[in-house]
């Protein structure tokens, strides 16, 4: 059976919605959904059949939606625009938190009452489960539970308890106190596994936290995690939320469909095709590098494969399992970031190269890039005698100045070729 587990992480839960949107668009169906903290809320919305409602709720989220906080204060805080009035406001709010013995969760509860429908959850054919931690004052006791074992009328309470961070005002369920389930299992794959699920997807939002992986060897699971940090969990900035929803959407496509890249989304070519491009790289472009290193009597292609590429991989801190194409794309991404190339788009390898070639240098990095354009195979010194930044940047601009034109095939050239092919194809336009 196929199930999905959503990791807890407060505002970072927006990432779940992007991943789920991409999964549902491609026909994925799940027999069960579980989660911890905000993951439990999002899982409940899936189970009750209200994904679109949940998606739009997140898309329109504002800081004041969940907490009694001034929106302008949050904007100034995010912009690091801190003045005396902000400090006074923060001091006043801190006193309220202390007086109330925690952050007021009235608005959080209102969200649950507005969106969660216990009857729909219980009537759904999908399994729903969550993790909470009971705390009796002496020791925490983890509670992993499915909907059929939650007392009637208490599903909202259990979801609320699953998200009960210690900084929140504590609430009890029938005299028992609970804290955030993330203190035990923040992404409850094993909860699904305990019910017979053997095909699992884990949607992470805090990938640095240890994941409790499935126990059974025959259980399949895919881990989808952010390509970049999602920000602070308790900051509900609408811009950040929307960006994380987009990131989730494209990270899912990258993971399931095997796209390449770390910060971009690139539909690569086969390793054999890329190897052919490297082999076709002109010897006359390699020879200046050989001369700068005092390499005599060595085949230019050996210089490329035995010197340039390994040193580039080391400078970029690429693992030993990195392919030649992986190294090439890592260089591309470094250049693309400097030029502020749009991230949330799926590029073919050649589209990505063409986009970089056509783009203008961003003002903030133009001077750096201009200096780098002067570097052409400046690798005469051994790598350990060159600072990592200098070495990496010199590679970047040699790569941008020369290798992009020879290893990459421009989209415009491809389009021209395809048009000619179309005209020659039995007369069809």
Question: Where do the protein language model's features map onto the residues?
Answer:
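Patatin-like phospholipase
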Residues: 1-36, 44-429
């Amino acid at each position: 059976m196929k199930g999905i587990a959503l990791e807890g992480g407060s505002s970072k839960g927006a990432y779940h919605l992007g991943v789920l949107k991409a999964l549902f668009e491609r026909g994925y169906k799940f027999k069960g959904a579980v989660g911890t903290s905000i993951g439990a809320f999002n899982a409940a919305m899936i189970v009750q059949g209200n994904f679109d409602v949940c998606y739009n709720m997140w898309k329109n989220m504002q800081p004041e939606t969940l907490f009694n906080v001034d929106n302008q204060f949050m904007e100034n805080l995010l912009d690091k625009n801190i003045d005396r009035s902000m400090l006074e406001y923060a001091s006043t709010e801190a006193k309220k938190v202390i007086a109330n013995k925690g952050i007021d969760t009235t608005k959080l509860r209102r969200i649950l009452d507005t969106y969660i429908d216990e009857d729909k959850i219980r009537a759904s054919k999908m399994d729903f489960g969550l993790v909470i931690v009971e705390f009796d004052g002496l020791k925490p006791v983890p509670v992993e539970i499915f909907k059929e074992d939650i007392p009637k009328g208490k599903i909202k309470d259990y979801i609320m308890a699953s998200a009960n961070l210690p900084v929140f005002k504590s609430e009890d369920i029938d005299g028992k106190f609970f804290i955030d389930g993330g203190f035990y299992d923040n992404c409850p794959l094993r909860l699904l596994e305990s019910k017979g699920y053997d095909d699992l997807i884990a949607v992470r939002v805090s990938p640095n936290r240890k994941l409790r992986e499935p126990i059974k060897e025959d259980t399949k699971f895919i881990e989808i995690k952010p390509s970049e940090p999602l920000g602070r969990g308790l900051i509900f900035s609408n811009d950040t939320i929307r960006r994380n929803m987009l990131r989730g959407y494209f990270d899912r496509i990258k993971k399931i469909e095997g796209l390449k890249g770390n910060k971009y989304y690139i539909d690569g070519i086969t390793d054999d095709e890329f190897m052919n491009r490297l082999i076709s790289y002109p010897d006359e472009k390699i020879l200046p590098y050989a001369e700068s290193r005092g390499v005599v009597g060595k085949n230019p292609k050996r210089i490329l494969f035995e010197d340039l590429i390994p040193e580039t991989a080391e400078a970029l801190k690429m693992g030993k399992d990195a392919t030649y194409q992986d190294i090439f794309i890592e260089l591309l991404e470094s250049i693309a970031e400097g030029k502020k190339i749009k991230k949330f788009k799926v590029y073919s390898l050649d589209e990505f190269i063409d986009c970089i070639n056509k783009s203008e240098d961003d003002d903030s990095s133009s001077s750096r890039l201009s200096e780098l354009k002067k570097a052409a195979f400046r690798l005469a010194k051994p790598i350990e005698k060159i600072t990592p930044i200098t070495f990496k940047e010199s590679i970047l601009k040699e790569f941008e100045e020369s290798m992009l034109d020879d290893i990459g095939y421009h989209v415009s050239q491809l389009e021209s070729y395809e048009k000619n092919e179309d005209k020659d194809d039995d007369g069809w336009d």
